Every structure is written in structure tokens, then in C-alpha cells.
Amino acid sequence: MLEARKAYFSLRSQSNKRMEIWAMDTLTDVRGHILSRRIRIGRNVALKSFDDVIPLETIAEINEFIDHLFGDTPERSQSGARIADLLRRGLVFRELEQSICANTRAMAAKIGHTDLPTEAFPVLRCASNTSLAESHCRHYDSHLLTLLIPLQLAPDGVHNGDLVMYRKPRLSVTTLTNVICKIRHGLLHSLPLSWRTWHTLHDLRVGHCRRIRVKPGSVYEFNGFALQHANLDVRNGQRRTLLIHYYDPGHSLGLSTVLRRGRIG
């Protein structure tokens, strides 16, 4: 394991250098405002939870809907538009979503983002032992707001797919630094699962991040553009989560759109 750790950090250092050179070469022909665009984020970003927003009867109905569509082993990610529509039938969720979105737009307007796209991007994420390639993959979202709605949990333990949230937010991001970060994360995602797992567990032990315990029926709000996060793996059962992303400020030169299409297929 010691040799694996040394190899991991050596590969990470070499990959970072190659990635930075590649990104600079790729972007040398881009001029003007696009590289100088910077988004600044307040220090008070934190995950917020809203308990008992969605009736458990609605959660059960949604899980039956998922079973009917995909069977016992739905693919790791699907468009969650239909599920989001089912949630919006409830007045409490609908009003909460509207309030959170209004607050996010007001925050974005203060930093000069008044023309954010209004279309939400809902994704159904189903994690199991067949989707380990998606586990322990730290990343930042492309969107300023994410609502996380747990639909079904896996058995409790270290392999239950919990969300892992890093404590230190990034507060100032340019298009170039964001693209470089996405490429670096992509290289880390290509590492073996055992290495990615060790890295996550190490960060948990030293306090760089924390596990977020969730429960079906509650709604969780966070700024995934500012807060790095990942998910533990799921070895038994299946964990189902609806993620609704809002307000992509366009700091990825189209890279996020390409990756998004690849995930949803």
C-alpha cells in the first residue's frame, strides 16, 4: 500500500503538470474576456438541509416509477425530469424550490451574473456495486446550485454511498482555472478504485471532508460549483438520489456539456 501511495502522488504530480501544459496550449488561441471571466463566491457557502419536505408516500411512488421504468438495476444515471415533475406536485417542495432558486439568482446578480440559463438539469443517480467507476470521484459541479433529494438508501456502513463534502470552498474561479480543475479531476477519476478510495478515506481521517448523512423525504441544498464533493461506493443494495442542478455560469468552454451528454447518454 505504501508503494501504491507513492505511485499515486507521483502520477498525480506528473498528470497535473501535463494537464496544465495541455490546457495552456489548447487555450492560447482564446482571447478577450473569456479567460479573464472570474466568479467570486461568498465565504458563507455551506450545505443546508430541509427536513420532511417530501411525503414518504411520494418517495414510495417515485421508487415504484423507477422500478417500472428500469427494473431492479437501473442505469447509473438517467434524466430525472419526470421525477422532478412528480416532486413539484407537492406544494411544500415547489415553494421551497422557488425560494432557493430566487435566493441563488439574487446572489449571482450581486457578482454580475444576471443572464444565467433558467433551465434546470435533473439527474437520477442510481449507485450499486455495478457503478463503482463513479465512486470516490471528487469533483466540482458546473452549476451554482444543486438540490439533492434522497430516494432510497443503501445499508448503512462505509460502503453506503454517502455524499462526502470537502470543507474548504473555492471562492474565486476563472474559466481557465475551472477547465484545468476539470481535467485534473478527470485524470484522478481514471485511477484504480482502491487508490481513489484510499484518497477519500485519508481525507476523511485528517478532516479535509465530512460524510453527509441524509434521509428520504428531506431536501439538501449546496453550491457544488464552490464545494468539492464525491460519493462513497455502494457494495450492497442500491442508493437512489435525484440531483437537480441550476444555473450554469458557463465557465467550462463547453467541456461540461460534453461530459454531461456522455453521462446521460
Feature annotation, model-predicted:
Residues 1-104, 218, 254-265:
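N-terminal auxiliary "cap/dimerization" subdomain that precedes the catalytic jelly-roll/cupin core
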Residues 5-9, 16-18, 70-73, 133-138, ...:
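Soluble, non-transmembrane catalytic domains of enzymes that act on hydrophobic metabolites at membranes
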Residues 45, 144, 239-241:
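Short hydrophobic/aromatic beta-strand or adjacent loop that forms the aromatic wall/cage
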Residues 111-123:
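A short coil-to-beta-strand element that immediately follows conserved catalytic motifs
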Residues 122, 147-149, 242-246:
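A structural signal for short, well-ordered beta-strand segments
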Residues 125-127:
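Flexible, solvent-exposed coil segments and beta strand-coil junctions
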Residues 129-216:
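Catalytic core of non-heme Fe(II) oxygenases with the double-stranded beta-helix
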Residues 174, 178, 185-265:
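Catalytic core of Fe(II)/2-oxoglutarate
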